[in-house]
Amino acid sequence: MPNHCYQYVYLAGNPKKIDRLYKAVKEERFLDEVIPQPTNLFHGALGEEERKMCEEKGISNWYDWRNENWLTKWDIKEPEICDEPTFEQDVKIFSFRCWTAWAPPTPVWDRLHEMGFDIHAEYEDEGGMFVGEYQNGEDKCWEPEEEEAC
């Protein structure tokens, strides 16, 4: 079953913040940089016992927390920088390609937009089930025509 969602992401914003995001992309911790995971998450394997233990202790587990907050179970994978950070007027820009599991991390993109970044992303499911485009808080997703599919 297809699992990857491939993305191209363009970001523009405050130079110091762009530098931090650029570093996070290269280290495959982009989503965690924007919406950090709580430090008290359970990070082990998740069977029935572990889920019960988390519920009893009142703590979340990594899997459910990431799905609820990022819409994907992992941070970005296999990032490829398309455009290195450069200045354009008073902002810094860069772009990259990557993939996430299942879906695009639109909550992360929404948070970046709320933080004042200019963000544009294009994404597609590896199985051709959906494609989409996100720009500054607006997400458009559709089922591609057969000739558009990956």
Which ranges hold each PLM region?
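Long, contiguous binding/interaction regions
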Residues: 1-150
